[in-house]
Amino acid sequence: MPNHHTLLSSSLFPVGSNISTWWNFGSMLLTCTALQISTGFFLAVHYTANINLAFSSIIHITRDVPYGWIMQNLHAIGASLFFLCIYIHIARGLYYGLYMNKGVWLSGTTLLIILMATAFFGYVLPWGQMSFWAATVITNLLTAVPYLGNSLTTWLWGGFSINDPTLTRFFALHFILPFLITSLSSIHIILLHNEGSNNPLGTNSDIDKVPIHPYHSYKDMFMISSMITLLFIVLSFMPDLLNDPENFSKANPMTTPQHIKPEWYFLFAYSILRSIPNKLGGTLALLMSVIILTTTPFTHTSYIRPMTFRPLTQALFWTLIATFITITWTATKQVEPPFTLISQVASVTYFSFFIINPIFGWAENKTMMNN
């Protein structure tokens, strides 16, 4: 094997030789983080956090700043790509039982929550019509908190309605949180290196390890290159593919959009929120849709770690994926039959996975013991 740079070699740990492409999404997420922070910095240089100037400053960036349209679209499309990668990353973790490494899984779930908060704050910044109303609807959920709700909402808004102080603090939070994400990502990786990566078979990799470089690093580079290629294809030919047409209009508190909805990556949680006709119940369900991921390390009952050799649980997993897509789709529709019923059934099915999965694990154990 050729000699490599000492610093590079010492920082790259040996891993199992059989890890698949599903293990590449960690490095892709790291690339997305670097891309978002770098493009975000250049956008922040030209952005003005003022309700009268924010929308105009976005137009200024797109039209007047050299390559500003590239920065703005890279940042917007990059956010969608970030969430696509993180959802695949989480699905891989659920399928292969990576949640059994509790420190890594819980730090990852914390990262997801902070990432969702960061993306929400960022969505408000252009001060378009959908940005304003999405912020109004979501921040209003704080009023569902007993006793403290109204005080918390006023504190978050910086007044009695969403106004200039709200935009200023959202910009400050959107700027600072990515650095917290970077720090937590470092902790996430350090915790992972305590035990090392799992593999598709769920077996101990100690007997068959290879250096990350060059074997797995080239695979990482290929997937990162593919991701960046996809990013630039969308940027060049379909830059507004994931934008809401309502957001091309400046925020107007006097006019409500016909259908208020957040970005696609929040639609699953938003659909769960809408499916419950009670404000407090919907808010709790919204929070639980993400927090419930933290329960998986404590409810795993099967003797076998991954789902690779568990056909019953595999069927349950793919039902969860289909449910996730269905919930996302229903959130794009109006709150009317049959979409209300579909989202309610899909929401129950989504949460059922986390209840039925341990039961299936227990049933599989019984079957194995009998055989």
UniProtKB/Swiss-Prot annotation:
Q: Which residues bind a ubiquinone?
A: 193
Cofactor(s) required, per the database record:
heme b
Please name the InterPro entries in this protein's record: Cyt_b/b6_C, Cyt_b/b6_C_sf, Cyt_b/b6_N, Cytb/b6-like_sf, Cytochrome_b, Cytochrome_b_C_euk/bac, Cytochrome_b_N_euk/bac, Di-haem_cyt_TM
Q: Name one GO cellular component term.
A: mitochondrial inner membrane
- Where is the protein found, in the record's own terms? Mitochondrion inner membrane
> Would you identify the family this protein belongs to, as annotated?
Belongs to the cytochrome b family.
Tell me the protein's name.
Answer: Cytochrome b
Q: Which gene encodes it?
A: MT-CYB
